């Protein structure tokens, strides 16, 4: 019975971590796009915050939907291999974002393909890295701990060098 509780708790950490990673990636992407287009400079602060409060969760839903399969593959590999370093999750977030860009390429009906724009592609990859680091902060630091009951789940101490 205790093992079932451990598995359910780990699953809850994974779901919460994925949701917060999508929100973090969305916030980062929104900030990059707003700064690149110079939005928010002429608007009062409540107007700019109001648009962010609406667009960040909406874009987070889109990110969570479109990046689900590559991210779940990375999370599953991280859990099975016990990957706990932030670099693994940052790089797999970038790879998941690159896969999303690959699926987006050529799907524009208006003639202007955002996925072909290198600046937009780099912004999406950077937001994928940011989301991967956010996932690591919530759930990645204890990846694989459910498989090895004696393994330490905290961060390592100082090296002493």
Where are these regions (language model features)?
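Juxtamembrane/disordered regions of integral membrane proteins
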Residues: 1-161
């Amino acid at each position: 019975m205790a093992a079932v509780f451990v598995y359910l708790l780990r699953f809850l950490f994974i779901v919460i971590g994925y949701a917060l990673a999508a929100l973090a990636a969305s916030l980062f992407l929104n900030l990059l796009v707003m700064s690149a287009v110079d939005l928010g400079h002429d608007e009062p602060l409540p107007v700019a915050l109001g648009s962010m409060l609406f667009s960040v969760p909406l874009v987070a839903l889109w990110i969570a939907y479109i990046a689900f399969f590559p991210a779940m593959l990375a999370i599953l590999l991280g859990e099975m291999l016990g990957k706990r370093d932030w670099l693994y999750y940052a790089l797999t977030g970038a790879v998941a974002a690159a896969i999303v860009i690959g699926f987006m390429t050529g799907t524009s009906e208006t003639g202007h393909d955002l996925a072909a724009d290198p600046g937009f592609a780099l912004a999406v990859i950077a937001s994928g890295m940011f989301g991967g680091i956010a996932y690591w902060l919530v759930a990645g630091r204890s990846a694989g701990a459910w498989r090895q009951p004696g393994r330490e789940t905290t961060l390592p101490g100082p090296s002493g060098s």
